[in-house]
């Protein structure tokens, strides 16, 4: 895994530990702010590969993208995620990819909490995985306090175009989420779910 490579990017602060533990934390903590800034630099470099403006060819482009992703995300280097630019993320190092991952363009990873993605997962264009949320109390919200809850996407999941996955959700193995759905609650394994909020409509029978 690339965890050792990105370890140096992870803030060594109490606020970071609060953040990934689902506790209220100060979003404008100095080290968290710097980590987001560093992430945006890497994100810009990755997104600038869109269109192969240097004419390096498909094979070299795939290699360069994998090298950039390895600087910020956690994954098995034998199977780098395939992500079409542009994409967006908060930190990057809180996203853990399984093998054979594919995301189409304009995907967003709001990773203030851990996003765990299994093997053979596919995301359509404009998918948003959002672990971040805010207090309902406006006084707490205005003070800069935020919190997040993890997202877990298990093996062999397909998430369709424009889906939004909200904090704390697990999508079970083999499930399919229809385009435009807003996933607010856990989805059982081998289930087709659609709508806003997403609701299971039938089981998927795998041969």
Swiss-Prot record:
Please give the GO cellular component terms listed in this UniProt entry.
Answer: cytosol; nucleus
Q: What SMART domains does this protein's entry cite? A: Mac (SM01266)
What the entry lists under Gene3D superfamilies is as follows: Hexapeptide repeat proteins (2.160.10.10)
Q: Can you tell me which family this protein belongs to? A: Belongs to the transferase hexapeptide repeat family.
CDD domains under this entry? Answer: LbH_MAT_GAT
Does the UniProt entry include the keyword Acyltransferase?
Answer: yes
Name the chain's protein.
Putative acetyltransferase C18B11.09c
- Its Enzyme Commission number(s) read 2.3.1.-
Identify the SUPFAM superfamilies for this entry: Trimeric LpxA-like enzymes
What highest taxon heads this organism's lineage? Eukaryota
Cite the entry's keywords alphabetically. Acyltransferase, Repeat, Transferase
Single GO molecular-function term?
acetyltransferase activity
